[in-house]
From Swiss-Prot:
Its cofactor is pyruvate. This is S-adenosylmethionine decarboxylase proenzyme. It catalyses: S-adenosyl-L-methionine + H(+) = S-adenosyl 3-(methylsulfanyl)propylamine + CO2. The keyword S-adenosyl-L-methionine applies. Is synthesized initially as an inactive proenzyme. Formation of the active enzyme involves a self-maturation process in which the active site pyruvoyl group is generated from an internal serine residue via an autocatalytic post-translational modification. Two non-identical subunits are generated from the proenzyme in this reaction, and the pyruvate is formed at the N-terminus of the alpha chain, which is derived from the carboxyl end of the proenzyme. Belongs to the prokaryotic AdoMetDC family. Type 1 subfamily. The lineage of its organism: Archaea, Thermoproteota, Thermoprotei, Sulfolobales, Sulfolobaceae. It comes from Saccharolobus islandicus (strain L.S.2.15 / Lassen #1) (Sulfolobus islandicus). The active site is at S69 (schiff-base intermediate with substrate), H74 (proton acceptor), C89 (proton donor).
Length: 122
C-alpha cells in the first residue's frame, strides 16, 4: 500500500488590460502613479515590498513588487493610453479589486480586462 502525498495548491490570479482615454496629467505624474499603486495594493489586500519607476519620454513605467507577486502600470500620455497588470499568488488577495481601482484613478473612459487563472495543483 503506497502513501498518498498531498501538496498545497498554488494560487495564481492575474488581471490585466489596456486603458484608453485616460487623464494624461495622471499618466505623466510618477509620484501620483506610485501612490495609486500603493492604494490599489491596499484595496486588493496585497503587501508591497518595493516600488520602482522610470520616466520614458512623456510616459512612466511603475513596477511594484508585492509579497504575492507584482503590479505594473505603463503609460503613454501622448495617446492617453496605459497598460496595467496585477498578478497575485495570494489566496487572500483580490487582483480584480486592485485593477478596478487603478482604472478609476487613471480616469479611463474605456478599457479591456483579461483574467487568467494561473493556479496549479501538484
Amino acid at each position: 500500500m503506497g502513501v498518498e502525498l498531498a501538496f498545497p495548491k498554488v494560487v495564481g490570479k492575474q488581471v490585466y488590460g489596456s486603458l484608453y482615454d485616460c487623464d494624461e496629467n495622471v499618466l505623466k505624474d510618477t509620484k501620483r502613479l506610485e501612490q495609486i499603486i500603493k492604494e490599489a495594493a491596499d484595496v486588493g489586500n496585497m503587501n508591497i515590498l518595493d516600488i520602482k519607476s522610470w520616466k520614458i519620454g512623456e510616459g512612466v513605467s511603475v513596477v511594484a513588487i508585492i509579497l504575492e507577486s507584482h503590479i505594473t502600470i505603463h503609460t503613454w500620455p501622448e495617446y492617453k493610453f496605459a497598460t496595467v497588470d496585477v498578478y497575485s499568488c495570494g489566496p487572500h488577495t483580490s487582483p480584480l479589486k486592485a485593477f478596478n481601482y487603478i482604472v478609476e484613478k487613471l480616469g479611463a473612459k474605456k478599457y479591456t480586462i483579461n483574467e487568467a487563472d494561473r493556479s496549479s495543483e501538484f
